[in-house]
Curated annotation (Swiss-Prot):
Pfam families: PPR, PPR_1, PPR_2, PPR_3. Transmembrane segments: none annotated. This is Pentatricopeptide repeat-containing protein At2g27800, mitochondrial. Keywords: Mitochondrion, Repeat, Transit peptide. PPR repeats lie at residues 206-236, 244-286, 287-322, 323-357, 358-392, 393-427. It is found in: Mitochondrion. Gene3D superfamilies: Tetratricopeptide repeat domain. GO terms for cellular component: mitochondrion. It comes from Arabidopsis thaliana (Mouse-ear cress). Belongs to the PPR family. P subfamily.
Amino acid sequence: MSATRSTFLGSIFRTAKARILISPIARRSLPSPNFTSSRFHTSSSLRQSRIEGSIPRSFLPSIHVRFHSVSASTWFSSRRTSSQGRLASVSMYIQYSTSVPTRSLRRRISNRKKSSAKPILNVSKFHETISKLPPRFTPEELADAITLEEDPFLCFHLFNWASQQPRFTHENCSYHIAIRKLGAAKMYQEMDDIVNQVLSVRHIGNENLYNSIIFYFTKAGKLIRAVNIFRHMVTSKNLECRPTIRTYHILFKALLGRGNNSYINHVYMETVRSLFRQMVDSGIEPDVFALNCLVKGYVLSLHVNDALRIFHQMSVVYDCEPNSFTYDYLIHGLCAQGRTINARELLSEMKGKGFVPNGKSYNSLVNAFALSGEIDDAVKCLWEMIENGRVVDFISYRTLVDESCRKGKYDEATRLLEMLREKQLVDRDSYDKLVNVLHKDL
């Protein structure tokens, strides 16, 4: 009976001693050591006791972190054996993990600290900039002062100071240069404050100003905010604020730059298609960049037939001739689906117009020809790619060597590796990897 009582009192003593080391904020959030919240499990023999909110003595010197609320994510547990042989289990939620954080986690923490760190205003430089302005300065003179200033945070305070001056009103030039300064410095919260001021004034705004706002919102990843600015332009009664072809270019580029996931591109492609239809219905003639955005979007979302339809309509319907980017997008999409016949036809048409495929198109052709068993065409395309100064990636070399061995052309694969080594087209590490591929297939 005395041993049981001493074990129970020792557990409570350890709990009280551990709570001394916990901050008052965390102490209020932790459960109190009673029978309901701390969940003491007492059996007839009291062989095991589980205490929430306590720390074993062996861990007390090594833990120097501040404990926070129960919303902390890591479960810290430890077991220790008492001198009498009894087992005590101790567990607690803490905010930090004992494992080393990954590189991506460290990068996110660093970026979060940089974004949350508030810049400090240089007061002397601020007063010096104000002193250079004339007594009755105009918005153009303020815009020139903001342009010459390198500190974007000082520009933001200078803009706000000018807003408080009597008989001064901002115009498009001062709004525009301030937004460009803050957007280029990635001070999006301060930029958003100025954008709200622009939207609150009806007679302020033009196409260049709103295009810059949309551009920097897309750079910040705020697509919804950018689309709302676009809708404001469409419904604006000021004709100078209506969207132009450049506005649609910014939105197309932002929507199609969301990654290489075909499902994500399929979702965003619906928005691109509706924007393109709205652009045509509003009387804006699409140019080759807008049409290439459609072709690229269809290729990224694996709708190559729709991309070919736009390609055939470019000169007939929209009076735009396809350029090298159009052919590069289509060749890559056709090769990704293994349609080497159509890709070869487009390649011949592209060369007939004097265009040279880029490295991505050549690599796609080499891989597609090799995977379809056309080894000779793949090797020919490879040497043509090297002659045109395009960079061959390691995947193309490996695919060509691997598929040559599958077809039983070991001599051709060996000869290709020797030529690559003699012309120093691959480094030593890549050459050894290709030799291992050849020996593995042998």
